[in-house]
Amino acid sequence: MPEADLSILNRVYDIILDRKENYDENSYVCKLLNHRKGMNKILEKVGEESIETILAVRNEDHKEIVSESSDLIFHLLVLLAANNVTLDEIAGELSARHEKMKRD
C-alpha cells in the first residue's frame, strides 16, 4: 500500500494557527475559536464528528467513513491548536509509543 502524503495535515494546521492569530469574520475556524461557548463549542464539534464517524463505520459506508473521519481530524486539529499542542508533539508521542512497542 503506498504511503500517504500527510503534509496536508501540516498545511491545514498552519492555516488554523494563522486564523488563531489573525481574525477573519468569514472564517469558520475563527468562529469556532472565538465562539461565545469557548472551548465547549470545539469540544461539541469533536464529539459530534466522533459520533458521526462511529455511525459511518457501523453502517459500513466507506465514503461516509472517509468524509466523517476528515471532519473529525479537522476539528481535532482545531482543538489541538486552541490548546497550543503542536503536531510535532503528537508525532513525537506516537514515535515514542511505536519504539516502545518494537522493544516489547
UniProtKB/Swiss-Prot annotation:
<dbReference type="GO" id="GO:0000105">
    <property type="term" value="P:L-histidine biosynthetic process"/>
</dbReference>
<keyword id="KW-0067">ATP-binding</keyword>
<dbReference type="GO" id="GO:0005737">
    <property type="term" value="C:cytoplasm"/>
</dbReference>
<dbReference type="InterPro" id="IPR021130">
    <property type="entry name" value="PRib-ATP_PPHydrolase-like"/>
</dbReference>
<keyword id="KW-0368">Histidine biosynthesis</keyword>
<dbReference type="GO" id="GO:0005524">
    <property type="term" value="F:ATP binding"/>
</dbReference>
<dbReference type="InterPro" id="IPR008179">
    <property type="entry name" value="HisE"/>
</dbReference>
<keyword id="KW-0378">Hydrolase</keyword>
<keyword id="KW-0547">Nucleotide-binding</keyword>
<keyword id="KW-0963">Cytoplasm</keyword>
<keyword id="KW-0028">Amino-acid biosynthesis</keyword>
<comment type="pathway">
    <text>Amino-acid biosynthesis; L-histidine biosynthesis; L-histidine from 5-phospho-alpha-D-ribose 1-diphosphate: step 2/9.</text>
</comment>
<protein>
    <recommendedName>
        <fullName>Phosphoribosyl-ATP pyrophosphatase</fullName>
        <ecNumber>3.6.1.31</ecNumber>
    </recommendedName>
</protein>
<dbReference type="Pfam" id="PF01503">
    <property type="entry name" value="PRA-PH"/>
</dbReference>
<dbReference type="GO" id="GO:0004636">
    <property type="term" value="F:phosphoribosyl-ATP diphosphatase activity"/>
</dbReference>
<comment type="similarity">
    <text>Belongs to the PRA-PH family.</text>
</comment>
